[in-house]
């Protein structure tokens, strides 16, 4: 045995804490928020994360001599305090790109958020951000279509797109489900949507739903002269079943399908995205289960990481929360990961939670979807926050209209167009929101009733997961 080999256990920081290291452009960089066990030095905790998420194990092993460990190991190169948190700290780790399979988000996450999250030396661990190098981005397929192609295909420009989730989301027969879709689309919406948990249940098998939805879309297109769509959820118990459903949607002439990317998994999502690109279909992505992973401020994976991974894995639309609705998410954090979905370059900006510069090159962008507890009074804020390259989805805010879903859809369409017109005229639509909506309501009885119905409805709860920024 080589004389270089010394059996036994040594501290992680002897090998994986490298404060003099300067990251390479080709390195994959990660920022972890670490909370170690009492008495364990920060450097040892951070080095343990670097080791266990790359080449390390608990003991020195002879087979290290068979490879170039210094080339392949992850390196913790910086530690920072977390503002306002004396228990936790940020560990910045650089990983050589050769540790990861090209184009595989599954492989990246298996390393970075694998066994290390169960490590006893850690009380909590959270993956806050990843900087993907351009060499890795170029190996990923990304969105099957992107923002501009979707606009061209749907022939919709100059404003956010408008949609809603069909309610009740479970329990309707296929025919009644199609009836609700028709009412919404003829009322003025661009899209309707399956909810995340409707697949193929006894009360409504997927073929039946797809057929009645297709009929509803064709009728509404004939009546309105506009291109319409419905997110047909093809998420299934096996990939083979998922592709069968996608093929049937294509046969029916539908423009868009849907996938629950976290419960379905990144491998399934990447495969479906490739299928959509090949077959000319748009792909809507729901983030069901995300809050289990991202809501705890000290443990899990931040949603900005999931959003980045989804852009690389592939999707044309992704749910991002609303800021003003019923779901978790403050304004600056939400804007931070919306930038990661849509922009070609996003600079480091701690005020938005972005720990690294991120160059996306020529990869197409993803529509940000605002959905969850929103109604017409929220429209000015939504237009201001999300901008044009977004989908604003009003579920209860459509179906809960006293005159029915068609009237709710009409109210939302009038409110949206009034806000876009006011914005284009240079008005501050958030400050002047009441005047803008009340004026539009004078010419739309549907909007006037909606404004009266939801005038007292607010979701004013403090955000659980807040940005760690210095005051």
Curated annotation (Swiss-Prot):
Main location: other
Protein encoded by which gene: cbbL
Residues annotated for Mg(2+) binding in this entry: 193, 195-196
The reaction(s) this protein catalyses: 2 (2R)-3-phosphoglycerate + 2 H(+) = D-ribulose 1,5-bisphosphate + CO2 + H2O; D-ribulose 1,5-bisphosphate + O2 = 2-phosphoglycolate + (2R)-3-phosphoglycerate + 2 H(+)
Record text on subunit structure and interactions: Heterohexadecamer of 8 large chains and 8 small chains. Forms a CsoS2-CsoS1-RuBisCO complex.
GO terms of molecular function: magnesium ion binding; monooxygenase activity; ribulose-bisphosphate carboxylase activity
Induction behaviour: Cells grown on urea as a nitrogen source have more activity than those grown on nitrate (at protein level). RuBisCO activity of urea- but not nitrate-grown cells decreases with rising temperature (from 25 to 28 degrees Celsius, present versus predicted future ocean temperatures); there is only one RuBisCO in this cyanobacterium.
GO cellular component labels: carboxysome
UniProt xrefs under HAMAP family: RuBisCO_L_type1
Binding site for substrate: 115, 165, 169, 287, 319, 371
Active site: 167, 286
Protein name in UniProt: Ribulose bisphosphate carboxylase large chain
GO biological process: photorespiration; reductive pentose-phosphate cycle
Gene3D superfamilies (UniProt xref): Ribulose bisphosphate carboxylase, large subunit, C-terminal domain, RuBisCO large subunit, N-terminal domain
Enzyme Commission no: 4.1.1.39
Cofactor comment text: Binds 1 Mg(2+) ion per subunit.
Required cofactor(s): Mg(2+)
């Amino acid at each position: 045995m080589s004389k270089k080999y010394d059996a036994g256990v040594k501290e992680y920081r002897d090998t994986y804490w490298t404060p003099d290291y300067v990251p390479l452009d080709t390195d994959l960089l990660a920022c972890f928020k670490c909370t170690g066990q009492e008495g364990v030095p920060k450097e040892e905790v951070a080095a343990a994360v670097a080791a266990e998420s790359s080449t390390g194990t608990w003991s020195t092993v002879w087979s290290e001599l068979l490879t170039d460990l210094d080339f392949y190991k992850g390196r913790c190169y910086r530690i920072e305090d977390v503002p306002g948190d004396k228990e936790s700290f940020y560990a910045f780790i650089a990983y050589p790109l050769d540790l990861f399979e090209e184009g595989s988000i599954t492989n990246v996450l298996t390393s970075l958020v694998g066994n290390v999250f169960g490590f006893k030396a850690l009380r909590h661990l959270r993956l806050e951000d990843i900087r993907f190098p351009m060499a890795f981005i170029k190996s990923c397929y990304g969105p099957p279509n992107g923002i501009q192609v979707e606009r061209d295909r749907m022939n919709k420009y100059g404003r956010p797109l408008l949609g809603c989730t069909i309610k009740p989301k479970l329990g309707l027969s296929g025919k009644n489900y199609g009836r609700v879709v028709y009412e919404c689309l003829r009322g003025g919406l661009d899209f309707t949507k399956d909810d995340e948990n409707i697949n193929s249940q006894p009360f409504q098998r997927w073929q039946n739903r797809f057929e009645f939805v297709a009929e509803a879309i064709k009728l509404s297109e004939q009546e309105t002269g506009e291109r319409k769509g419905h997110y047909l959820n093809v998420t299934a118990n096996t990939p083979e079943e998922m592709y069968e459903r996608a093929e049937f949607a294509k046969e029916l002439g539908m423009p868009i399908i849907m996938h629950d990317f976290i419960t379905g998994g990144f491998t399934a999502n990447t495969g479906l995205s490739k299928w959509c690109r090949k077959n000319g279909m748009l792909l809507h992505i729901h983030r069901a289960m995300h809050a289990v992973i991202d809501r705890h401020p000290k443990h899990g994976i931040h949603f900005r990481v999931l959003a980045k991974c989804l852009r690389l894995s592939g999707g044309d639309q992704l749910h991002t929360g609303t800021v003003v609705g019923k779901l978790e998410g403050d304004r600056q954090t939400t804007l931070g990961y919306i930038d990661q979905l849509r922009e070609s370059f996003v600079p480091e900006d701690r005020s938005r939670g972005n720990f690294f510069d991120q160059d996306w090159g020529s990869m197409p962008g993803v529509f940000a979807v605002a959905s969850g507890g929103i109604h017409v009074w929220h429209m000015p804020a939504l237009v201001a926050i999300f901008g044009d390259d977004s989908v604003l989805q009003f579920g209860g805010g459509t179906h809960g209209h006293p005159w029915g879903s068609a009237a709710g859809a009409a109210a939302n369409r009038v409110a949206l167009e009034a806000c876009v017109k006011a914005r284009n005229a240079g008005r501050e639509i958030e400050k002047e929101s009441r005047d803008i909506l009340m004026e539009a309501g004078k010419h739309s009885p549907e909007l006037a009733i909606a404004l009266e119905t939801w005038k007292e409805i607010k979701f004013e709860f403090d955000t659980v997961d807040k940005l760690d920024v210095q005051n």
